[in-house]
Amino acid sequence: MNAGRVFTEKYLRLMFKSLRDATPEEVMEELEHCRRENRRPVRIPRYFRGFFVEDEKFRASTGFEMQVFRHEVPELVEGPKHNLILYLHGGAFIYPPVFFHGRFLHDIALRTHCDALMPVYPKSPEYDCEYSVKTLLEYYQSLSESKRYDEIHLVGDSAGACLCLVVAQEAHKNGWQKPATTTLLSPCVDLNHTKEKEMQALQDKDSMLQYDRIVILNAIWQGKLAAMHPWVSPVFGDLGCIDNLCVYYGSDEILQPDDLFLKAMYEKAGKSGIFQEYEGMFHTFAMFPIPEGFRATKKIAAFIKERRLH
């Protein structure tokens, strides 16, 4: 086991310890903290100020003004600018984007020579799934109707990967521009918790997530929608409409059974995608600066480039 991976996993265990070990009451306190924090605008970390700029806020019919960050590829990188990576960040539906999201998106954008946008969508507990999805769908519709990009490539991690599947399904349903590729990192796709026993069996191996806490957070995010509603659990939606699907996940995360379930359901819909399970890896490992993360990032970039038409 390499030193970088050991350090990263220990760092993650420490960073998420308060939520992993929290009582239900402490989880609710954390949610209220997130509610206050999410009312504040997200700031670009100093390290990324040469690459990311804040785009114009998108005002949805819901009334929400959504921050959007644009990645500007330096002039020294040659390549077409008419392809877009739309990145939906994770964070248990409650947290804003962090440094590792920016680092990963920066790397992917440089490797693929694509423009990149990262919207800061509405979060729980202030907003629920229905409100947030409506906001994101309006934003995607605006991108589609602008005809600015020849291709849109969806990329997301964890909760954001869930939303990527929702957007891809709704784009097909509504006749909007179809995503050229959809890439998911450790997606959370089944809030019905169909694989509950299998998820709990992996609990001791997971350095970030705690099953009981996820159930609480997911129930609040779910709002009034049914657990098997395709906006809540897109694994039960129209998977047959999604082409060029690529999924990366680790064997040591409690969402691994979810991702195997997604693979089975995708194949049941008559589709064939790329599902890469990395042995001994943790949740969203591909985002982190470790050898396995670098290798996964290179493969993801190659996947996008190989399936580009322009």
Model-derived features: positions:
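A glycine/proline-hinged amphipathic helix-loop "lid/cap" segment
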Residues: 1-76, 309
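Alpha/beta-hydrolase superfamily serine-hydrolase fold, recognizing
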Residues: 62-67, 75-310
